[in-house]
Amino acid sequence: MAEKTVRVQQIGSPIRREASQRETLIGLKLNKLHRIAELPDTPSVRGMIAKVHHLVRVLDGAA
């Protein structure tokens, strides 16, 4: 069975954000606006998305 994934798009700039938020975006494989990353749907990835929820958008209707 295929592993579940989540697609995340960066919609906010990391400029003037805390260093931990910038590092979280890098951990999510996002470094420029409007880039999309497909990541495994794990609790750790979901936690990272929650930490920078104001800078990213989850695509494909998954919440």
Curated annotation (Swiss-Prot):
One of the record's GO molecular function terms: structural constituent of ribosome
Alphabetical keyword list: Ribonucleoprotein, Ribosomal protein
Source taxon at top rank: Bacteria
GO biological process: translation
A cellular component term, taken from the record's GO annotations: cytosolic large ribosomal subunit
Glycosyltransferase recorded as keyword: no
Record PANTHER family: LARGE RIBOSOMAL SUBUNIT PROTEIN UL30M, MITOCHONDRIAL RIBOSOMAL PROTEIN L30
UniProt subunit comment: Part of the 50S ribosomal subunit.
Family from the record: Belongs to the universal ribosomal protein uL30 family.
NCBIfam families: rpmD_bact (TIGR01308)
Protein name (database record): Large ribosomal subunit protein uL30
Lineage of the species this protein comes from: Bacteria, Pseudomonadati, Pseudomonadota, Alphaproteobacteria, Hyphomicrobiales
